[in-house]
UniProtKB/Swiss-Prot annotation:
Gene Ontology cellular component list: cytosol
Pathway named in the protein's UniProt entry: Metabolic intermediate biosynthesis; chorismate biosynthesis; chorismate from D-erythrose 4-phosphate and phosphoenolpyruvate: step 7/7
Keywords: Amino-acid biosynthesis, Aromatic amino acid biosynthesis, FAD, Flavoprotein, FMN, Lyase, NADP
Pfam family, one: Chorismate_synt
HAMAP family: Chorismate_synth
Gene3D superfamilies registered for this protein in UniProt: Chorismate synthase AroC
Origin species: Thermoanaerobacter sp. (strain X514)
Protein name: Chorismate synthase
InterPro entries documented for this protein: Chorismate_synth, Chorismate_synth_AroC_sf, Chorismate_synthase_CS
Gene transcribed to yield this protein: aroC
Cofactor(s), names only, from the UniProt record: FMNH2
Length: 350
């Protein structure tokens, strides 16, 4: 499978096109809309979330609620577009440190940085959550589930303290990042491959996780902690039971060994940096005058860690769904499930 997204933060709509879905997959729009709603929630979100009411509109690829094998096109309307339509907006010339502003303006020869930030904005992730929700619907047919939890915000792991530290950051004109854990359950042994570098499952997942705006680090299982331990305290010993088959009593590998899923839950942690739009802006340079200025301020969140967790679920669900289709094949959901069940029987009897 593959997908692309299109649209700007304050454009008329966001669009996503998914190619390669099997036919007869039930597209539950209520589920997709609930996932979009999740993305809009969480502590520290900005005023934009009070404007938008993200809902998916299927444009093609579905008949009677099910996919038909052709590309699935979906649209999410930007309600805030009405507030910008026809409005003359002054050029933005003061890049924000930590954003794509300066690099993007230089790369694409843009004297108005808004032409960069409109696409680099995390608003684009609404389209990816919709895409990932479709992937989740496919995975549900195979009893594979993706979930997440926020481990830290602003270095604090106690959830009850998050509202307080977020308000403190807001009062100081600052922003906060955090750490998110993604758990993928029900993944069989055998997704990914050791035979080529670009087929390794952990590499594919890391690539997609790192593609999410503001994500600056990723680890699997023990991650960096594995570098501090001897091998005897890192590697997961192998056991066998006639009913369970091969299994492990620990999961330090995070469900992947040699680039291949090993049957344990896949455990990923991602580090999200603080949002680079600060109410009290950092120093910058005006790209026209070349004079020292304060960076521009755009309406933004204090933190979006909880929202990012939903986005990370989506991109990870996409990878696992894509790998399932690569391995098991099937032009219809019925064929995919038949092939998948046969493979599970093979693994059980190995």
């Amino acid at each position: 499978m593959r997908y692309i997204t299109a649209g700007e933060s304050h454009g008329e709509a966001l669009i996503a096109v998914i190619e390669g879905l099997p036919a007869n997959l039930l597209i539950d729009e209520d589920f997709i809309n609930k996932e979009l709603k999740r993305r809009q929630g969480g502590h520290g979100r900005g005023k934009r979330m009070a404007i938008e009411e993200d809902k998916v509109h299927v444009l093609s690829g579905v008949s009677n609620g099910k996919t038909i094998g052709s590309p699935l096109a979906i649209q999410i309307i930007n309600k805030d577009y009405e507030n910008w339509k026809g409005k003359i907006v002054p050029a933005m010339t003061r890049p924000r440190p930590g954003h794509a502003d300066l690099s993007g303006a230089i790369k694409y020869n843009q004297r108005d940085i808004r032409n960069v930030l409109e696409r680099s904005s995390a608003r684009e992730t609404a389209a990816r959550v919709a895409v990932g929700s479709v992937a989740k619907l496919l995975l549900k047919e195979l009893n594979i589930f993706v979930k997440s939890k926020v481990l830290e915000i602003g270095g604090i792991s106690v959830e009850e303290e998050w509202p307080k530290i977020i308000e403190e950051a807001k009062s100081k004109g600052d922003t906060l990042g955090g750490v998110i854990e993604i758990i993928i359950e029900g993944v069989p042994i055998g997704l990914g491959s050791h035979v080529q570098w670009d087929r390794k499952l952990d590499a594919l997942l890391a690539y997609h996780v790192m593609s999410v705006q503001a994500i600056k680090g990723v680890e699997f299982g023990l991650g960096f902690e594995a570098a501090r331990r001897p091998g005897s305290l890192v590697h997961d010993e192998i056991y066998y039971d006639k009913e369970r088959g091969f299994y492990r009593k620990s999961n330090n590998a995070g469900g992947i060994e040699g680039g291949i899923s090993n049957g344990s839950p896949i455990i990923i942690k991602a580090a999200m940096k603080p949002i680079p739009t600060l109410l009290k802006p950092l120093n910058s340079i005006d790209i026209n005058s070349k004079k020292q200025v304060k960076a521009a301020y755009e309406r933004s969140d204090v933190t979006a860690v909880e929202a990012a967790a939903c986005v990370l679920e989506a991109v990870c669900a996409w990878v696992i769904a894509d790998e399932c289709l690569k391995k098991f094949g099937g032009d219809s959901i019925e064929e995919l499930k038949k092939n998948y069940d046969a493979y599970l029987e093979y693994v059980k009897n190995f």
